[in-house]
Amino acid sequence: EILIGLVGSEMCIRDRFPVYKMIDTCASEFDSYVPYFYSTYEEENESIAEDRKKILVLGSGPIRIGQGVEFDYSTVHAVKTIRNAGYEAIVINNNPETVSTDYTTSDKLYFEPLCVEDVMNVIELERPDGVIASLGGQTAVNLAEPLESRGVTIIGTDCEAIEKAENRESFEKLLAALSIPQPKGQAVTNIEDGVKAAAAIGYPVLVRPSFVLGGRAMQIVAKEEQLRQYLKTAVEINEEKPVLVDHYIRGKEVEIDGICDGQDVFVPGIMELVERTGVHSGDSISVYPSYSISDHVKEVILDYTRRLGLGIGIRGLFNIQFIVDQEENVYIIEVNPRSSRTVPFLSKATGYSLADIATRVILGISLKEQGIDTCYPEEKSFWYVKAPAFSFAKLNGMDAYLSPEMKSTGEAIGYDRKFPRAMYKALIASGVKMQNYGTVMVTLADEDKEEALPLIRRFYEMGFNIEATVGTGEFLKAHGIRTRIRRKLSENSTEILEAIRSGYVSYVINTRAILSGVHYEDGLAIRRTAIENNVTMFTSLDTVKVLLDVLEEITIGVSPLYA
C-alpha cells in the first residue's frame, strides 16, 4: 500500500523489473567472473541470457526443521545430470549453506527468494525450456501451480499430478478407483465439522493441516476437548486451508522412494521404520532392507506403488508412506509427488543415484533406456540404518517427546553385515550415548506397561538397576523386577529430577498415553531434565527394543570395517 501510494498503482509497481548483479567473490581485489547473481533495482543488468537450451531447477530454500539439506542433495545431482545432457543448468535458491548455492555447481545461480514474483523475474529474463519443481522439496512443489498458471512450462511431475496427490478429495477418488485402502478420514473447514468427523471416524484421530512439510502442527488427539483446543489454537482452519482428520492406526510404518516414467515404476528399496505410526518418519530410525515385514507385504507395497505412480501421472521421483497393521493389512498414509528426505540415504544404501535417474526421466529418457528393466532389484546383503539427530539441548523448552511433528535436525548412517552393529554405528554417530551398565529410570503410561514389561526385564537381567515412578514401579515389582520407587512432581517431590541430575542414570524411558489422551506435567519436566543433563532418553518402546538388541549383541573391542 505504501508503494502504491508513492508510484500510483499496482501495475506501475509490476512494470518495474529488477536487474541482476554479479557477486564479486574477490571483493574487488582481483578480476573475477562467477555466474552468481542477486537482484536489485538499478539500471545495468549483468546477467546476460544465452541463446541455448536451458533448464531451471527450483531449490529447497532455507534449512529448517522438516526441510533440511537432504533436499539439496536432489537439486545438486539434478543439476549435474542436466549439464551432462548438454543443457544450461540454472538454479534459484536462497540458502548460502547448501551445495546448490556453490557457484561452481550450476551454469548460473540466482540467489533469490523462492516466491512467485522473484522466480518469475528470473524466468522472464532467462526464458528456460522447462522448470523442474519436483526436486526441491515441498517449497519448490508449492510454486508449480502459480508458475504454470503464468505460462511457465513445468517439466517432470506436472500440476495436475501434484493436485491428484496433495488434494484430499482428488486423492481419495484416485485411491477408490485403484482399490487401494487408506485410513478413514475427512477434510474439514471448521471446528464443528472437525468434531463431527472425529466422532464418526472414531478416536484417536490424527489431525494435520494440508500442504505442509515436516508434519508441522500435526497431532494425535484422543478426546473431543483436545480436538477443539487443537482446532482453535494450533492451526488456521477455513475453506482455503482445510484440516485433515484421519483415524489413527497403530502399526508398522514403511516408506519407499520410487521413480516413474509414465510406463514403468522403479523402486530401489523398501525402508522399514523402527518406531510405529505416531512418530514422524523424519524422527524415526529407518532401516534398509526391511527387517520384519513379510514377502507378501512387500509384494502388496510394490503393487500399490506401481498403481499410484502410473495413476497419479508421476514423471520422476515420488515418495509413499504406508501403514502395516497387525493383520498385515497395508494402508496408504500419503504420497509425496517429489523428492524426499530419504533420497540420499536410499541412494547410498542401494547404489542407485535416484536423483540422477529421475532427472533423466524428466528429460525424456525412459527407465528402460537407462538400463533399468526391473521394478524391485535384489536387496543388499548389508544392513543400512539411518538414525535421526536431535538438537533438544539447544532448543530451550522444546518437548523432546517424539510425535507426528518432526523435531530432528540431522541424521547419521551406519551399515554392517549384522543388523545390531549397523544400528550401533548409526546411533553412536547420531549422538546417542550408550552404556551397558548403570540405572534405567522408567515412567510409563498405563497403556504401555504390559508391552514394556519384557523390555524392562531384559535391562534387569543385564544387570541394570531399575528406578521408576510409583505406578510404574509397583507394576514392575508385582512382576518380579526389583525397583526403587521415586516420587512424582505431582507428589510435591523433585527426587526423580534430582536422580536424573546426579549423573548415575544411564537411560530414561518415558512414554505418555495416546489412547486415553491423558498427559501429565511430570513427563515434560522429566524429559527436559534428561536432555539438559545429557542423559539418553527414549519416548518410544520400539526404540528401546532395538537399543536392547544392540546392547546384547555389541561387545567393546575391535571389529572389521566392511568396505
At which residue positions do the language-model features occur?
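Single conserved hydrophobic/aromatic residue that forms the stacking wall/gate
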Residues: 1-8, 13
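Short, solvent-exposed alpha-helical "recognition" segments
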Residues: 10, 14-22, 267
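ATP-binding N-terminal substructure of ATP-dependent carboxylate-amine bond-forming enzymes
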Residues: 21-180, 189-196, 415-561
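ATP-dependent carboxylate activation and anion-phosphoryl transfer catalytic cores
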Residues: 28, 49, 53, 72, ...
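Acidic/histidine-enriched active-site and ligand-binding environments that engage anionic O-linkages
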Residues: 196-205
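Glycine/aspartate-rich loop-and-adjacent alpha/beta segment that forms the canonical ThDP
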Residues: 219-222, 558-563
